[in-house]
Swiss-Prot record:
Gene: GLV7
Species, as recorded: Arabidopsis thaliana
Region described as Disordered: 59-90
UniProt-recorded name of the protein: Protein GOLVEN 7
Keyword list, A-Z: Differentiation, Growth factor, Hydroxylation, Secreted, Signal, Sulfation
Compositional bias per record (Basic and acidic residues), positions renumbered to this chain: 63-88
Similarity annotation: Belongs to the RGF family.
Amino acid sequence: MTTLSKILCVLIILLLCFSFRYSLHEDGNQQSSRDFVSTAKAIKYGDVMKKMIRGRKLMMASGEKEEAETKMKRGNRETERNSSKSVEEDGLVAYTADYWRAKHHPPKNN
């Protein structure tokens, strides 16, 4: 009997802790008391940032065309930037993949 009462007590405490984790706001929506929102909810409501900066590159978070970023206007013509990467940016990359092409240097002692 004491084991059953202990288990019941622990379950009640966990239920209360879980219920106090959420708070009702003025508009009646039940939201978490934490400061962050999941990405799925942010995309659903449109609160996601359009651009995010990662390293030295400006990446588009909304899936816009990247072709506009890789083209430059020089005078009257458009030229594409030559990239030395051997891995395309359109999918997952194996952890052991070569990320850069081999660079061919002239012989050292000729």
